[in-house]
């Protein structure tokens, strides 16, 4: 996966949407492709706002819970080293990436949104780690 693929996903919702490489606050050891706010030159039109609400790109933001957990994993690698780790509802994949960086035997990003799995894959590659992807944990 690449930034181009993620940009294509974003543009399904917001025509001017794109990703940029970011390092989330509190977890600067991980780089992620996230929504680039510089594309917003003003307020969203009514149609754009409706599209964002109808099909939100949750994966294009790094949620605080993921940032905190990823940082904790990197600070405490012994908890995941050599183990199989599941990042359930992975979104950007930050927790799976952190687990892989911390030495997990396998880090699995699981999300029902195919675009989120593309984001997790792209973010793993950006950080030089390998993760597994799972669309449905049944």
What spans do the regions from the language model cover?
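Conserved SAM/SAH cofactor-binding pocket of Class I
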Residues: 65, 71-137
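N-terminal auxiliary segments of SAM/dcSAM-dependent transferases
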Residues: 1-41
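Domain-scale activation on soluble regions of proteins
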Residues: 9, 45-47, 88
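Generic detector of short, locally flexible boundary/turn motifs and exposed helical patches
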Residues: 1, 34-36, 50-53, 112-118
């Amino acid at each position: 996966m690449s930034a181009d693929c993620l940009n294509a996903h974003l543009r399904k919702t917001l025509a001017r949407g794109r990703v940029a490489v970011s390092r989330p606050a509190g977890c600067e050891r991980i780089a992620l492709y996230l929504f680039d706010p510089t594309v917003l030159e003003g307020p969203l039109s009514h149609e754009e706002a409706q599209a964002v609400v109808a099909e939100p790109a949750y994966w294009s933001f790094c949620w605080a819970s993921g940032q905190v957990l990823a940082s904790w994993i990197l600070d405490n690698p012994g908890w995941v080293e050599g183990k199989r780790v599941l990042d359930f509802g992975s979104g950007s994949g930050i927790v799976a990436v952190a687990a892989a960086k911390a030495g997990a035997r396998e880090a699995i990003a699981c999300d029902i949104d195919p675009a989120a799995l593309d984001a997790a894959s792209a973010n793993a590659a950006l950080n030089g780690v390998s993760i597994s992807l799972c669309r449905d944990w049944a």
